[in-house]
């Protein structure tokens, strides 16, 4: 569960290292986001010569959460940390590589480009 002010790691090579959630998209009263949800983030840490700079506002899709997510078959999945992949307005990833595993829930949300770039889908 991601909410405003949550710090997330970035799981791609866009150049950002840490981002902070500043808005959960999908309704004016929506408070929490989970795997596959799109959020608005502010870049808090970035490497030099990055595609995104520190202080920039971007969109991101959540690919891993510490909070467990229940699946239709009754199983749960959770990860060691909260991670996101930066995306543009067309919901395409900004980076060209994805680091670490991503959740299968992204496939149902039509993030096929992220699924294909990921080294492992859990």
Swiss-Prot record:
Q: Which GO terms describe its cellular component?
A: cytosolic large ribosomal subunit
Q: Which Gene3D superfamilies match?
A: Ribosomal protein L14
PROSITE patterns xrefs: RIBOSOMAL_L14
- List the residue ranges forming a coiled coil, or say none: none
The yes or no answer to whether the keyword RNA-binding is present is yes
Q: Does the keyword Amino-acid biosynthesis apply?
A: no
* Molecular function GO terms recorded: large ribosomal subunit rRNA binding; structural constituent of ribosome
So which residues are the signal peptide here? none
Q: What GO terms in the biological process aspect are recorded for it? A: translation
Q: Which InterPro entries does UniProt cross-reference here? A: Ribosomal_uL14 (IPR000218), Ribosomal_uL14_bac-type (IPR005745), Ribosomal_uL14_CS (IPR019972), Ribosomal_uL14_sf (IPR036853)
Q: What Pfam families does the entry give? A: Ribosomal_L14 (PF00238)
Q: What is its quaternary makeup?
A: Part of the 50S ribosomal subunit. Forms a cluster with proteins L3 and L19. In the 70S ribosome, L14 and L19 interact and together make contacts with the 16S rRNA in bridges B5 and B8.
Q: What does this protein do?
A: Binds to 23S rRNA. Forms part of two intersubunit bridges in the 70S ribosome.
Q: Which family does it belong to?
A: Belongs to the universal ribosomal protein uL14 family.
- Its recorded name reads Large ribosomal subunit protein uL14
The organism is Anaeromyxobacter sp. (strain Fw109-5)
């Amino acid at each position: 569960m991601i909410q405003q002010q949550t710090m997330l790691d970035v799981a791609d090579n866009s150049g950002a290292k840490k981002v902070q959630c500043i808005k959960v998209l999908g309704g004016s009263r929506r408070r929490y986001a989970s795997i596959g949800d799109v959020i608005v983030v502010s870049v808090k840490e970035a490497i030099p010569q990055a595609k995104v700079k520190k202080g920039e506002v971007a969109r991101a899709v959540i690919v891993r959460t510490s909070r467990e997510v229940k699946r239709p078959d009754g199983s749960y999945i959770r990860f060691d940390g909260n991670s996101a992949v930066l995306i543009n307005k067309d919901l395409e990833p900004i980076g060209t590589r994805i680091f670490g595993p991503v959740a299968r829930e992204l496939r149902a949300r039509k993030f096929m480009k992220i699924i294909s770039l990921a080294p492992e889908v859990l």
